[in-house]
Amino acid sequence: MSMTDPIADMLTRIRNANIRGSSEVAIPSSKIKKSIAEILKDEGFIEDWEVSSDEDSFPEIKLQLKYLNDGQPVIRKIKRESKPGLRVYLKSNDAKPVLSGQGISIITTSKGVMSDRKCREEKVGGEILCTVW
């Protein structure tokens, strides 16, 4: 069975792992998911990530989720913005901070996948994949 929206599947797996309080979540690997994981790590939303592969199975991205001292997840909300049926685009001059800078948008651009902060620095727009805070 094919998956119609693998990015939404990734975000749902992260959301479900946060609800369960899991320290790690496994996600089927792809280039765009690796880029999203790297941005989440750089912005401080996850501890780390790595790609693991056995000879018998497909490669997986293992995300190590991050929690506060009181056990609350660092990712309070993670939301898919652009969907296969409704694409959402952002012009370079329309990139505004998410929740006054407390969150980020992850955007795919002609220069690669980057956070909204980096888009403002580079003055580039693109498709908004998701928002995290």
Regions flagged by a language model, labelled:
Residues 1-133:
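Core subunits and conserved enzymes of cellular information-processing
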